[in-house]
Every structure is written in structure tokens, then in C-alpha cells.
Amino acid sequence: MAEKTYHEQERNKCILELRRLQSELPKFLKDYFRGIEYSTAPRTQIAYATDLKTFFEYIKDTNSMYKNTDIHDIDLGILSRLNAQDIEEYLDYLKLYTKNGHELANDERAIKRKLSALRSMYHYYHKNRIIKENPVTQVDLPKIHKKQIIRLDDEEVGELLNVVESGDHLTKKQSECHDKLKVRD
């Protein structure tokens, strides 16, 4: 039997990882993942599963109705009971929260991605008429602020080039490599 290609191996790893994540998610999400299987990449499905796990952990921790419920046993009815304000509270929670004693923070891009996972899930159930309302459509996507490009000024560029050429402030081993590369180049 021929060995599997790299892509086949990676695909199989993704399938196993997705199955592992699905076992930690509410049972009703199996239909959702089956529904998006052919329209999304395996890594996207894994990212969605991870983000939805965070969402359902939030539901479990903040909703008294689900405090003593295992995430796997949360029912589909939760989607109908949530409104746009609940989703906005979740997005606010994502900015900074504690999990397993560690403080976690998400920037605008991460929050937007997590909201995209929720949008996709709600869209699937709404499109298939399993839920009547889709409160996520009422929530605006976070604005992504452009990162400022940090550039070296002319003086800093000159200093950098001088250090590279001269090999100053290098360890003995680095200096030996520098000398060899200098001769080669």
C-alpha cells in the first residue's frame, strides 16, 4: 500500500482534531459541522470548533441555567433564547477573561473571527429553519484598526548596515560565522 501524501496526512490530522473538538461541544453541532463540511476548509472548521467551544464555555459559566450542565449536553434551545445583547456581552467578555487560572485577551481580529464562527453557526440553523431568529446579524463586526508600520529612519538604517558589515558585538562563534559569510558574499 502506498504511503499517504503530506496533504492526506494533514487532512487526516485535521479530521481527528475536529472529531476531538466535536466531542467537547454540544451534540447538536454535529449537524452544523456536517453541513459546512464541503463549503469550508478543514482548518477553518477546526478554528470554528475552537471558537464555538469558547462561546459555550462562556454560556456555561455565565448562564445559571447551564451552570451544572456539561457543555456536551447543552441543548439547541439555547440559540433561540439568546439575543443580540447577549452576543455583545460575549464579545465584551472576549476582550479579557480568565480560563484555568490564566488571563486571556483577544484583539479585534480574534474577536471578529470568533463572531464569524457564531455567525456561521447561527446562519446554518436559521437557513435550515431550525431556529426562527438570528440575533448575530444585529451585531456589528468589530472594526479592525490598521497597525502602524514601524520603519527605521535613515540614521538607524546606516547604523544597522554598519553593525552587519563590521560584525561588532558578536560572540566568538557568531564572529566566526560572520567572517566566513563576509568572505563568501
Which role does the model predict for each range below?
Residues 1-46, 77, 81:
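N-terminal DNA-binding module of tyrosine recombinases/phage integrases
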Residues 28-43, 53-148, 163, 167-168:
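N-terminal core-binding DNA-recognition domain of tyrosine recombinases/integrases
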